[in-house]
Amino acid sequence: LLSKKIEVFVNIMQISEIEEKAIKKICFFLQPVKIKALYIADSLGSLNNKSFLKVANKFKKFWSGELGLHAHDNLRLALSNSLLATKSGFKWIDSTISGMGRGPGNLKTEEIIKYYNLKDIKFVRLLKKKYFDRLKKHYKWGTNKYYKFAARQKIHPTYIQEMLSDKRYGKKNYSSIANSLKESETTK
């Protein structure tokens, strides 16, 4: 890909679960590849600001190239973690209109635009209203108390997404199912 003048980004998932030894190996392996940036993804959406900085500093310790962040919004911390990333030297932050993404969603474009007081906010709000609000209602992305619970327990959001979309269960079952997921995660 690089020989075809295609810029390559590598996304490392579930960064909240990676130990420093593995981070060092990943960075050492990728260093000679000349990728555009090494992206880290908070796949479980479980990183608070302090834990994000701890993980980010581990990557910065071993990676000399550009860094990027893909923040999930389970705990409603995608914006604050993204702002911390930029303040600590990350060059790349991604976002989606209305936080569009599987399950709890991602950093919302309109939040980052509003924070930086950019002129594009009216256009993004128009797109959101015209297209994305309807899509969000149909596909039901966005965080809720079950995604927040999963993030705190380090349960992958796919389990919650499956639970919420399974017609066999109703709201009265969700808490007991989420708690059983917690129990099965702690027995691993």
Q: Which functions belong to the PLM regions below?
A:
Residues 1-188:
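Catalytic cores and adjacent flexible loops of soluble metabolic enzymes
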